[in-house]
């Protein structure tokens, strides 16, 4: 497997072992040992996931790991759309994902990462618009939960 990949996404297991999301379709979970990448798990995901690119690291929320990803649609210019992907912290199986969304309806938006503030039930999301701004959004987890589609 290729060692230099800009769209890899990192997360840690419950036992603090580093893992890599290598691709989103299939959801390919890897580990790095001695400069070699080893596939641990491959999981079937919706066809839409073929277009996903990593944006954020995985964030643990209870028994789930949340990722903020994006895809690029080349309509007349490139348009960025975002999606939260939620997997099981135990099995890495896909649990749910959100509908596609934008932050400001700008063509070029890129997520810089996010954090979850459990006591407030809110996400703090950093993002850029048109490759020349840095902005933050605070949004309730309940709002994101309303946007989710349960994977079957």
What are these regions (language model features)?
Residues 1-152:
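Beta-propeller domains
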